[in-house]
């Protein structure tokens, strides 16, 4: 174990924690929780189920936020006690435990520090992530599947539940497209920096001549709507198509037309769902995602940020945000933040927190510069 100046490190932890406390405004947080708790305890709360759901959901999010902060404060105090005992008794095991806990707290504070930067209108929401294969043929489809696994592994590492909502398999290998939900507070604010075009450079395993291939995939992230969001879509604006669910290689995995495709005629936004067991369930899931996309579309139109609209991301040379190079060298590099990592296997296994953190800070700096 390397020599660690625990006194200096603990002072740094406390300084970072106090900075987060000031930004969070603990007094306002506790007042918000008290007010929401009072409203949640009203006997007529569930007379309006949609409003009740919003209140209880926000209360849960705010309580989790307070718990994260208070737990970290306790862990810093406990670390200080552990270090004192270890040093007084010359206990190498205790000091090793203290070093591991120091690293763990530093990481937790860093993650919490990034969360304080998430102040967008929908940043607290759960997220729906869609991945589409772009230019590059079968390599692009394979890349889309690699990205899907990367994000699902990232969510798994954080203990975030996920639900795969739709998968459209390519003929030879990989995915044409996929959609999944990440069920965690701030999932949208966190993952929205991943939206854009991703590029893969490697020796193609599908090329008999072993040539280097460049392929692309587009990632879209939208906030999941809540029941109280005002998004009404007239029936005459939606075209409904039903078809049989398909698996790898285009084979049918269902004997009934349970898969559903919804097209919003005025905007051209298309949503497909096939992973639920019934057509009714797929239609309900597709409608919720369609409403979510239109909600974000409306906000982005109001903000005149049309570049990020659903369907506007072209999975080709333009608008690249990250490159994954596996040959002639190994490097994953974010083209916006310049953050790069040489361990490509770890990245594809879901270790992307540093990319996300850098992306959130980059976005915050850009927003502040525009003010």
From Swiss-Prot:
Protein name, as recorded: Peptide chain release factor 2
Pfam families in the cross-refs: PCRF, RF-1
Listed GO MF terms: translation release factor activity, codon specific
Transmembrane recorded as keyword: no
Subcellular location: Cytoplasm
GO terms under cellular component: cytoplasm
N5-methylglutamine PTM positions: 251
UniProt KW keywords: Cytoplasm, Methylation, Protein biosynthesis
InterPro entries: PCRF (IPR005139), Pep_chain_release_fac_I (IPR000352), Pep_chain_release_fac_I_sf (IPR045853), PrfB (IPR004374)
Family listed: Belongs to the prokaryotic/mitochondrial release factor family.
Modification after translation, per record: Methylated by PrmC. Methylation increases the termination efficiency of RF2.
Organism whose genome encodes this protein: Pseudarthrobacter chlorophenolicus (strain ATCC 700700 / DSM 12829 / CIP 107037 / JCM 12360 / KCTC 9906 / NCIMB 13794 / A6) (Arthrobacter chlorophenolicus)
Function text: Peptide chain release factor 2 directs the termination of translation in response to the peptide chain termination codons UGA and UAA.
SUPFAM superfamilies associated with the record: Release factor (SSF75620)
Originating gene: prfB
């Amino acid at each position: 174990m390397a020599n660690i100046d625990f006194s200096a490190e603990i002072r740094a932890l406390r300084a970072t924690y106090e900075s987060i406390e000031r930004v969070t405004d603990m007094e306002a947080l506790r007042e918000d929780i008290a007010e929401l708790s009072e409203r949640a305890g009203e006997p007529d709360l569930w007379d309006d189920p949609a409003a009740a759901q919003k209140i209880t959901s926000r209360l849960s999010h705010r309580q989790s936020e307070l718990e994260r902060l208070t737990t970290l404060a306790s862990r810093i105090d406990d670390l200080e006690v552990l270090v004192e005992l270890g040093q007084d008794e010359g206990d190498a095991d205790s000091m090793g435990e203290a070093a591991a806990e120091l690293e763990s707290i530093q990481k937790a504070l860093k993650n919490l520090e990034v969360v304080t930067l998430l102040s967008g209108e929908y940043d607290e929401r759960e997220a729906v992530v869609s991945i589409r294969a772009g230019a590059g043929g079968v390599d692009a489809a394979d890349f889309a599947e690699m990205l899907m696994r990367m994000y699902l592994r990232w969510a798994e590492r954080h203990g975030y539940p996920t639900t795969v909502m739709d998968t459209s398999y390519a003929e030879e290998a990989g995915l044409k497209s996929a959609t999944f939900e990440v069920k965690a507070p701030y999932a949208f604010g966190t993952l929205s920096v991943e939206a854009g075009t991703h590029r893969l450079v490697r020796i193609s395993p599908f090329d008999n001549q072993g040539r280097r291939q460049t392929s692309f995939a587009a990632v879209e992230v939208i906030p999941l709507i809540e029941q109280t969001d005002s998004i009404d879509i007239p029936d005459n604006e939606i075209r409904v198509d039903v078809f049989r669910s398909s698996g790898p290689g285009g084979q049918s995995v269902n004997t009934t037309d349970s898969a559903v495709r919804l097209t919003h005629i005025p905007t051209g936004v298309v949503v497909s769902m096939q992973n639920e067991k019934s057509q009714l369930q797929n239609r309900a899931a597709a409608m919720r995602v369609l409403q979510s996309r239109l909600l974000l579309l409306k906000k982005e139109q109001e903000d005149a940020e049309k570049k990020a609209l659903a369907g506007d991301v072209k999975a080709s040379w333009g608008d690249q945000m990250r490159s994954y190079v596996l040959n002639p060298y190994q490097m994953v590099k974010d083209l916006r933040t310049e953050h790069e990592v040489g361990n490509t296997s770890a990245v594809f296994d879901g270790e992307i927190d540093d990319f996300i953190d850098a992306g959130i800070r980059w976005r915050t700096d850009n927003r502040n510069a525009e003010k």
